[in-house]
Amino acid sequence: MSEDNILTPQGWVRGRLLHQDGKVIAIEGSPCNPADNDLPYLLPGFIDLHVHGGGGKDIMQGRDAFQTITRTHVRFGTTSLLATTMTAPSEEIRQVLEQLGSYAEQRPQGCARVLGVHLELSLIHI
């Protein structure tokens, strides 16, 4: 295992991140100033709460666009996101929501995780 500059809620640590089954179980090391060394940076992933698209694709394009969008976002540090719809006919939005639900359950490797949906509409009737 290599040492990294790890950003924690308490500040920077020079050390190692230990993980098991995809979860962080410990961070070993001591406080540091990353400017004092040439080690790589290890940062938490970002959660984007408003994603219309990525990689030239839009959420409203449906199932075929989702993998391009989520793969593009993970390349830039977004580990999870809320897919955001646009104002459209209700049937189109319903189809996209169904497809997003199915895609989110699959959780493809190498892609940002879809946590849910941000409905962006001009008016919602309940």
Label every model-predicted segment.
Residues 119:
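Conserved, mostly hydrophobic/aromatic
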Residues 124-126:
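Conserved small/polar residues in nucleotide/adenosyl-binding loops
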Residues 52, 86, 122:
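Flexible loop residues that form catalytic
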Residues 24-32, 94-101:
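A short, flexible low-complexity segment enriched in Lys/Arg and Gly/Pro that occurs
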Residues 116:
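Active-site microenvironments of hydrolase-like enzyme catalytic domains
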Residues 41-42, 59-112:
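Alpha-helical scaffold segments that flank or form the walls of functional sites
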Residues 1-31:
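N-terminal metal-binding scaffold of metallo-dependent hydrolase/deaminase domains
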